[in-house]
Each structure stands twice: as C-alpha cells, then as structure tokens.
Regions:
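Conserved NAD(P)+-binding/catalytic subdomain of aldehyde/semialdehyde dehydrogenases
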Residues: 175-263
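A glycine- and small/hydrophobic-rich beta-loop-beta segment
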Residues: 258, 266-341
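N-terminal Rossmann-like NAD(P)+-binding subdomain of aldehyde/semialdehyde dehydrogenases
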Residues: 1-119
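C-terminal core of ALDH-fold dehydrogenases
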Residues: 318-427
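Conserved small-residue-rich beta-alpha loop and adjacent elements
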Residues: 103-169
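Short acidic-hydrophobic, aromatic-tinged amphipathic segments that line or gate anion-handling sites
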Residues: 1-7, 178-183, 303-308
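Flexible, glycine/charged-enriched surface loops at secondary-structure junctions
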Residues: 98-103, 225, 262-267, 287-297, ...
Length: 427
C-alpha cells in the first residue's frame, strides 16, 4: 500500500482517483454478443455458454428437482445463516415502505404520489471464484417485499451444468420466481430482450465483471433499466490512536480479497496506528487463501496520514467510498458529517462483513465514486412513483391564470388553450 503523509488539499483530487475502467474497448465485443442474443435467443445463449462457461446445456431453466436437491447439499449451519440473514434483510427493508399523502397545493388542487412495484425484474449473480449467494438475498428479498410479480435470476453454471447449491437455496428462501443457467453478457442480453426461455424484464440488478458492466450500460440506453453504474469493490477506514490495528487490517483485507481491481484506503490521524496497521496487513495477508488477489488489490491502495479527524472526514467525503468504516473513539460525531458514502459502519465492532451478509442493510452499493450521486439498492429501487393531481373548478380559478401566463411566455399556445377553454367554461 502506498503511504501518503499530510497531503495538501491540492493533492486530494489525485489521491481519490480510482484505477480507470475503460469499457469502450469492450463495447464492440459486447455489442456483437447482445445483437446475437436479440436475434437468436436461446440458441445464442447456449452457444455462448459453451464458448465462455465451457458447458453444453440442453435447457437453460433450473428445475424444481435441482432446487430440492440443492437443499440437501448445503450444511444446516449455512442454511440457518441464510435464514437469519434473510430475516434481517427483510426487517430492514420492510421499514422502507413508502407512505405517501395527499396534499392540497392550492384550494381545489390536490396532488399525491402512488408507489408501484416494477412488475418484472432480473437479478444477475456472477460466477467466478466464489458463489455470491449473499447477493441473491440482497437483491431478491427487497424485490419480493416490493411486490414485483416476476423475479428472474440468471447465474452461470459450472462445467457440469450445475448451479452452486447455496445460490439455489438462497433464491428459494428469498422468493425468486425462476432461475436460469446463463452468465456474462449473454445473461444480460437475455433478460433485456427476452428469449424463448428467459422472460424480458424491465430492470436488471446485480454485479459482474467489466463485460457485464458494459452490457448493462448498453441495454440501459434503449431496452431495460439497470440498478446503477458499478465498479470494483472498495472500502475506506477512518482510524485514530484508539482504533484496533488488528480489526482495521482485517477490514482492509476483507475488501482487498474481492478482486485484483479492488481498492482499500486507510485515513488516520496517528502515525503509530498507520505503522501498526501496515504490520498487521502484512501478517494477515500471509494467511489468506486469496493472498495473490489481495496483494494485487493492495498495490492500488493507500494509507493516508492527516492532521485531524475533521480533515479525515472531508477527505473521505471527497473520495465517496462504497463502504466507510469509522473506527474512531468519537464515531458518532463523525457520522453526522458523512455526506458521500454507500454504507457506513460505526465503531470498533461494525465490520464491513456484517453488512455484506447479515446485519440487514443492503450490500449492493455504488462504487467508483458514484456514491456522490447514487444510493445503494433499497426498496425504492424496485418501485416507480406515479404522480396524480386532481383539479376542481376552484382549482382552475386558483392556478388557471398562472398556467396561461407561463404557457404564453414559453410560446406554447396549445398548452395555454387547454387551460383557457376550462376557464371560459366556468365563466
């Protein structure tokens, strides 16, 4: 990890830069696959599964028999953990239900909002080196609570055509409607356009590699909404002299092991803490099975020494991390100053892993600085809000002339006339 001591404000813009993700170079490949999926449906999906996932599939759909079999293939301990996590995620997201109210903006003018679930949503769960069954819970649970009628899940199978059993069990626990064996760009295209087997959805959620990111961005231009732009995983830890260096190092490594393009940042006011965390990172790194991945991520990462905790907080807000851990003695006062972050973890015992799995908050969060403008996945992500307004004759008299004047000054005569004919009818 690169160590930076007492950087000036002028240096901050360079410090907060992430490794650049240039998906433009992938767009030609992604576009070719998406076009093929749009034209050829299931046959194209199966062909790309054979090419990229090295599996020959007769059918894309996961059967009920496969799901039942999966339940006997995971330990009771894991099943109980999935159920507990699902309960907590449900409890947290249930509190996010929208309760709109009717408001009279002027006499005779009543306005309100209605929250309506997106009818069909698609969830993408990547394959790779670890089965992300936790992401199944994070995406499917709020979709079910929101009232989405159809929850489709796509995930790549292994070379034997099997989906990891924990993913199947998590999908059943969370209420997924149907599961399909498809990964990568072909899965995104199938959900965006629809195939003979895989239904077209209206919004796609879920993480993935750069090809998946590029595919989501492309389909979002014309065919299907997406949850948010995405980048590599990241964490920022703010520490002071009272922090536990073993805990801090463990938190940094928990994100570094995600992928070689992950980034972890330590901001501290203590030179001694910086040194002790550096030592702990090196010690714990040697014990990790994913040491090679974490080591490469650490090469993109930084330890930053600053003068005050206020400065640390300002630097963090400039960075806008996906995950922010405030492991300081006065974490409560610093928490009030957070304005840019995906999810925040307060105190010595709130490890980021808790939010990743079982505290109840959602772990699908904006990365790569998008926390400046985006929220993480929440219940509203699965809803649309439709506005209503009702005008009585009194309402026409209240706002009619203002509407006429504004329309006239925008030179939209038909707009003005739509109000004028009503005013005349009341004369």
């Amino acid at each position: 990890m690169r160590i930076i001591r007492y950087p000036s404000r002028e240096e901050w813009s360079n410090i907060v830069k992430r490794p650049q993700l240039d998906v433009s170079l992938l767009n030609a490949i992604v576009d070719e696959v998406l076009t093929d999926i749009r034209r050829n449906g299931d046959s194209a999906v199966k062909a790309y599964e054979a090419k990229f996932d090295h599996v020959e599939l007769q059918s894309l759909a996961v059967t009920d028999e496969e799901i039942r079999a999966a339940e006997g293939m995971i330990s009771k301990e894991l099943y109980d953990a999935l159920v507990l996590a699902h309960q907590n995620i449900s409890t947290f997201h249930e509190t996010q239900r929208f309760e709109g109210s009717k408001i009279q903006t002027q006499p005779g003018v009543t306005c309100w909002q209605k929250s309506v679930p997106i009818e069909k949503v698609g969830l993408y769960i990547p394959g790779g080196t670890a089965p992300l069954f936790s992401t199944v819970l994070m995406l499917a649970t709020p979709a079910k609570i929101a009232g989405c009628k159809e929850i489709i899940l796509c995930t790549p199978p292994d070379r034997h055509g099997n989906v990891h059993p924990a993913i199947l069990v998590a999908a059943k626990v969370a209420g997924v409607s149907r599961i399909f064996k498809a990964g990568g760009v072909q899965a995104i295209g199938a959900m965006a356009y629809g195939t003979e087997s895989i239904p077209k959805v209206y919004k796609i959620f879920g993480p993935g590699n750069q090809y998946v990111m590029a595919a989501k961005q492309q389909v979002s231009l014309h065919d299907c909404a997406i949850d948010m732009p995405a980048g590599p995983s990241e964490v920022c830890v703010i520490a002071d002299a009272t922090s536990n260096p073993e805990f801090v190092a463990a938190d940094l490594l928990s994100q570094a092991e995600h992928g070689t393009d992950s980034q972890v940042i330590l901001i501290t006011t203590s030179e001694e803490m910086l040194k002790r965390v550096e030592e702990e990172v090196n010690l714990q790194l040697e014990l990790l099975p994913r040491k090679d991945i974490a080591s490469k991520a650490l090469s993109n990462s930084k330890m930053i020494l600053v003068s005050t905790l206020d400065e640390a907080m300002q630097l963090s807000n400039t960075y806008a991390p996906e995950h922010l851990i405030i492991a300081t003695q006065n974490y409560e006062s610093l928490a009030d100053k957070v304005v840019n972050a995906g999810s925040v973890f307060l105190g010595q015992y709130a490890c980021e892993s808790a939010g990743d799995y079982a505290s109840g908050t959602n772990h699908t969060l904006p990365t790569h600085g998008y926390a400046l403008a985006y929220s993480g996945v929440n219940l509203d992500s699965y809803h649309r809000k439709i506005t209503f307004q009702h005008l009585t004759p009194e309402g026409i008299r209240s706002i009619g002339r203002a509407v006429e004047v504004m329309a006239e000054n925008e030179k939209l005569d038909a707009h003005k006339n739509a109000m004028t004919v009503r005013i005349k009818a009341l004369s």
